[in-house]
Amino acid sequence: MAVISMKQLLEAGVHFGHQTRRWNPKMKPYIFTERNGIYIIDLQKTVKMIDSAYNFVKDAAADDGVILFVGTKKQAQDSIEEEATRAGQYYVNHRWLGGTLTNWNTIQTRIKRLKDLKKMEADGTFERLPKKEVSLLMKQRAKLEKFLGGIEDMPRIPDVIFIVDPRKEQIAVKEAQKLNIPIVAMVDTNTDPDDIDVIIPSNDDAIRAVRLITSKMADAVIEGRQGEDEDVTEDSFKDNKDAKKSVDSLEDIVEAVEGDNDAKSDK
């Protein structure tokens, strides 16, 4: 049974690709049609490929794998942090620092500095220092927290990386490839899918689309770690029943697209 229904994908605007002039021809197999200058993603394929991604992440989590969630674009930042945290995993939701994976030892020294600064604040060290020095240390801590807070407690290089918009996160993609770390990613119609191990064809610009798919990847981690989540299964079953009533075919989706521009912002 599908972990996400056609109805859920449609309501979140997952089917909206980019403008036809901004496409990557390698995404052609995942495109259903074109409407009003926008490519429409084939949601029947997306449903199946989300299932594959879900099972891939679930199996990795069941083997005690470390999953890193990555999404630094504005539309993804909140979802990436919230869902990774909910799943007990790790995230990068601001600028990816070059060498985060390939120069892990150096990154660890910066993380140690972050932890030291937190300890200094907690144990009262700051109270014994000049205000000007404390101000500088606080700024340093805030900067380190912003870029490294999501991986502060990551025990090792991740076993799987989930990425929102690999086109934007090219440095992360290259580092993962160099270290042979599998990449699961939301891939829009303007992106080269060849760089990704497990593809989820989808709109990667709409906040609702990003949140929906990111939350399902978090669900996969939770299920892998704790066993099958009955609530998730029951909700999926209910959603699929509802979907049969409202979305019978891709033609229904195309009809829904006509005149609907809500999910095409920033395209």
UniProtKB/Swiss-Prot annotation:
Keywords for this protein: Ribonucleoprotein, Ribosomal protein
Disordered: annotated span: 224-244
UniProt keyword Ribosomal protein present: yes
InterPro entries, sorted: Ribosomal_uS2, Ribosomal_uS2_bac/mit/plastid, Ribosomal_uS2_CS, Ribosomal_uS2_flav_dom_sf
One Pfam family from the record: Ribosomal_S2
GO cellular component terms, semicolon-separated: cytosolic small ribosomal subunit
CDD domains listed in its UniProt record: RPS2
GO molecular function, one term: structural constituent of ribosome
Family under the similarity heading: Belongs to the universal ribosomal protein uS2 family.
PANTHER family named in the record: 30S RIBOSOMAL PROTEIN S2 PROKARYOTIC AND ORGANELLAR, SMALL RIBOSOMAL SUBUNIT PROTEIN US2M
Protein name (Swiss-Prot/TrEMBL): Small ribosomal subunit protein uS2
